[in-house]
Amino acid sequence: MKLTVQPVDINYISQIWPLIEEYLQEALTKDNGAPSWSECYNIHHVQAFITSGVWLLLVATDEDKTIHGAATVSFSNYPINRVAFVTLIGGRMISSQDTFEQLKMILKQRGATKVQGYGRESIVRLWKRFGFEPRTTLVEAKL
């Protein structure tokens, strides 16, 4: 099955939300070795981030326009790089070189020079095939 990765215009978020919510909820609740996102935000916060334009929503569709996965991306500007950070990813999204190339093109069109994201070990192994390298270990303490 050939998947097409595409951004969702902010004006259509409410229309497709029922079709993608389960993919993002799955990403929130799946243990991925990253911080417990449920302590930071829930699915309602995610929807607010997307509908307000803070996060970009991407979907993966087949030839019949059926959605098979969804992802969200935030952007951070640093002095030397504009980093696209994959905040959530669920379903079948970036599982092949082709879908990764599509993701890269979309992020480059939005000015990104790097892409980053947290991932459990299986995602790290998969994404290493696409040129990702583990960068650091995140540590955290409650204040």
Q: Over which residues does each language-model region extend?
A:
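Active-site rim helix/loop that mediates acceptor-substrate recognition in acyltransferases
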Residues: A34-V54
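Short amphipathic alpha-helix that is part of the acyltransferase structural core
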Residues: M1-C40
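Short glycine-aromatic motifs
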Residues: V54-W55, R129-E133
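Conserved catalytic-core motifs of GNAT/GCN5-like acyltransferases
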Residues: Y118, E133-L143
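A residue-level signal for beta-strand positions that form part of recognition/binding surfaces
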Residues: K2, V83, T136
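Acyl-donor binding region in acyl/amide transferases
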Residues: N81-F130
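Charged/polar, solvent-exposed surface patches and flexible loops
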Residues: Q15-E26, A48, M105, R125, ...
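Conserved donor-binding loop and adjoining core beta-sheet/short helix segment
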Residues: T51-I94
